[in-house]
């Protein structure tokens, strides 16, 4: 009923001036102007945000072949953020050979946005858990050095701002490796530089930042993260995230103590208290390292992507908004793409229904409807099937759901004539 209400009332009664450039001939011969904005996240393990967008567009244009369709592939600051923002702004991709979490060379890519002075980096490209075989994971030795190398590469491109997504790390070094790559010296009592990795931070005696690249402090870094954990303690980086990175119970205890010592030295030598800052524990403490060694600010990932993709501008005049991701549940309200897209587009196109597609719909989604953001959620799989088959069929299934929604739009509009 809600879907019929928003389609019929909002579009036909409230939208007297649809104002879109594409003319569509309705089922009764009346000229109708419709604009569809398509802004999904990726379906992880299946399709990128761009591929999901294309599948939705195919379904819509089967019914409305001349529709004004605006594709805005999205992300929430994690996986896919570089692709989404670089594509959205017609930027370019840069690939560098950097240091992976365990010190081996690895190719990592980042984006330069269309403005030419903003870079977008995912720390996981250089320091991510996916780069380390499950049997080789070692948060005692894992380093964010490669992330620092990507930052330096971006500075060499002449950027003045960096968007840095910090999800999916293999590390627990408090951003120490990143700082070392940028030129900081982490010294033991004998004046020797520490080896890379969070397991050696207990040896830290002093920090010398005189060698840090001077461009670092002149460059604004936006940290895209929704993690609010402090650096240490029962809710800190080591305790909450260490085990998934391979930390044993003993390692967790040592890593947590090492990070506490690390922050004590930061406070002594840099005059900064970072231990309890919300988000300092993100990405194995990289949040703390960025705050300590760079000119940085934390911001919700989806808010950054909404801003830099120009979603609000591109959604002006929208009649329908499609979003989605692989799974939607009650936690989607907390920084996930579908909810962020819905909130943003409602500000500029308040009568446009927001239609979310998901590979899996979880429990307790009623709160998403009650929030006056997402209007309706559809599951995309066409019947029960094995996971590998569901993944393979994702493009066709998404296209079919989008086509059926477009048919419903057309039927509802015809009924109001």
Which positions does each model-derived feature cover?
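Phospho-regulatory, low-complexity terminal regions
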Residues: 7, 32-33
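Intrinsic-disorder-associated, low-complexity terminal segments enriched in Asp/Asn/His/Tyr and depleted
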Residues: 4, 10-13, 17
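N-terminal loops that bind phosphate or other acidic moieties
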Residues: 33-166, 170-417
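Cationic, low-complexity basic patches in intrinsically disordered or flexible, solvent-exposed regions
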Residues: 24
